[in-house]
Amino acid sequence: MCAGCGHDSISSAIIQACFELNIEPHRVAKLSGIGCSSKTPDYLLGQSHGFNSVHGRMPSVLTGANLANRELLYMGVSGDGDSASIGIGQFVHAIRRGVNMVYIVENNGVYGLTKGQFSATADKGSKSKRGIANMDEPLDLIGMAMILGATYVGRSFSGDKQQLVPLIKGAI
């Protein structure tokens, strides 16, 4: 993982939340898209179900799995590039359809795997490693989720486990 990356902290918080809620791993299906979050299904809850879908399409794959087996707890983990760029339509329609899932967006405002381009959620004026400022207004995924009628919306810093674990438990 890159220095300062929050993905491992988020995976750890998911594990702790499931443990505290006594959720048996075989009752969980974890799905991801492409990007830094793509390996998340491999990092947590051994003996659970996991699938890494194509770029931006995790919500549709999760929807299909949910229709096939409604007995599982579905957790989708996606990056800001995966959800706010190529997968923005998937993000919107999964919420609009009310898919029974926990959808975690790991948002760092940057495409880490492709050397640091700004994602659609990067703050306007933030600077890249090369000193170039982002000129675009960021997409607000939290605001969009609320407007679209998501039943539970939360935001946390990946490094604050005391805040993150209860938010994930609430989402579950």
Question: What is the predicted role of each segment?
Answer:
Residues 1-54:
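Active-site diphosphate/adenylate-binding microenvironment
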Residues 3, 76-78, 152-157:
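Short catalytic-loop micro-motif centered on adjacent basic/acidic residues
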Residues 7-10, 19-23, 67-70, 96-100, ...:
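Generic secondary-structure signature for well-ordered alpha-helical cores
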Residues 120-170:
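Conserved thiamine diphosphate
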Residues 1, 6-13, 26, 87-90, ...:
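General structural feature for long, well-ordered alpha-helical segments within catalytic domains
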Residues 19, 46-48, 91-93, 119-120, ...:
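Short, solvent-exposed amphipathic alpha-helical segments in soluble enzyme
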Residues 88-93, 113-125, 144:
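Active-site-proximal loop->helix
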Residues 34-112, 163-166:
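Thiamine diphosphate
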